[in-house]
Regions:
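A short mixed-secondary-structure module that forms the rim of ligand-binding clefts
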Residues: 46-83
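Histidine- and/or cysteine-centered catalytic micro-motif in compact active-site loops
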Residues: 31-33, 59-61, 79-81, 90-94
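Charged, gly/pro-rich active-site loop segments
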Residues: 1-8, 89-152
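Short, surface-exposed beta-edge/turn micro-motifs
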Residues: 23-25, 52-54, 71-74, 84, ...
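A short, Trp-centered hydrophobic/proline-enriched beta-strand micro-motif
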Residues: 18-35, 74-78
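N-terminal leader/targeting segments and the immediate start of mature chains
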Residues: 1-25
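A positional/architectural concept
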Residues: 36-43
């Protein structure tokens, strides 16, 4: 049996938060419109805020940041095969150099990529504002839910 449910506003954001917190690592895709296909790389989501934005750290001169500057449309693919949960987020990315936001999002694990810590000159923050998100929660091989989420 296949069930579809549309969530908006707070319900959508709450569901997005719970899924991202459970999965954390996603494939972060840029260059969505190229003939060679999208460019994807694994990224750890830091937080989903109350507005529904998904936050990441990135090196300021990375290929990813350059791709976002050229075209800010992105897709995030989260997958938890052990729990049969899958999430796709379509949105727009913005690169920021906000020290207060870096301080807010900082975790000790981030020092693996940014050896100088919160003050590393190469650190940037990426904010992904979702336009839509689709979530599948399956029980074995059976589809249970497909949720369409639109963050406000």
């Amino acid at each position: 049996m296949n069930h579809t449910e549309n969530l908006t506003n707070k319900d959508a954001i709450d569901k997005l938060k719970s899924l991202v917190e459970d999965i954390l690592v996603c494939l972060f895709c840029t260059n969505l419109k190229t003939d060679d296909g999208a460019t994807s790389r694994p990224m750890s989501a830091l937080k989903v805020c109350d507005q529904g934005n998904v936050w990441f750290f990135s090196e300021k001169n990375s290929d990813k940041n350059q791709a976002i500057e050229a075209d800010n449309k992105v897709q995030l693919f989260f997958s938890h095969p052990g729990k049969s949960r899958y999430l796709i987020v379509n949105g727009e990315a913005e690169i920021m150099f906000d020290k207060a936001k870096i301080e807010e999002l900082w975790t000790p694990v981030a020092k693996i990529w940014f050896e100088q810590g919160k003050d590393d000159p190469d650190i940037s923050v990426i904010k992904v504002t979702p336009n839509t998100a689709y979530y599948w929660d399956t029980d074995g091989n059976r589809m249970i839910n497909l949720l369409k989420m639109a963050a406000s």
